[in-house]
Amino acid sequence: YAKTMGFLCDQNGIENMLITGTNDKQASHAWNIIKVDGDWYNLDTTWDDPVGKFPADYIKYNYFLVTDKEIHNKTHFVDNQFYAPPKCDATKANYQRNYGLYAEDKDKALSLIKSEIKKAADSKNGYVQIKVSSEKILNDINNELIKNKAIYTYVDEANKTAKHKCKVTTAPVLDKNVLTIHITLNY
């Protein structure tokens, strides 16, 4: 994945580097860093492949243009024995931030989820994803969605005016490393 992404970046004039190291299970791993508007970002197409908990048609952006703080020494460990890659500390091109899917507090996160469920139901999109600023907020919104059943309220409200009626049949999927929550909707 990482070599292919590097090739695609090269073909399109996007400055990039292949980063090697290990993952959180000490297995060899490679990912890219790419330069967007003068800033470097981590990009891991391997870990954004929808394998496992997600349907094959789902496009994740968990590891798309993320900072070192989000992944280094958590899930990605750089082998910097021979070189030190540029720091990746910018956030402005991050997918969720760039598309208004980022929240810095619980109320904003819940409001985003509610509006994204409505948008998804109108367009028959089966997926909602947002990013939050802390693990506490991630846990708080998950509790609100599941324990307090807010997710069902949001779906019911969306279905009142949506072009397509949706339902939720699985619990939201959390990625505590990059602070994202994913909701799958069925039609």
List PLM regions with ranges.
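N-terminal accessory/pre-domain segments preceding catalytic cores
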Residues: 66-187
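Hydrophobic/aromatic-rich core segments of domains that either
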Residues: 1-66
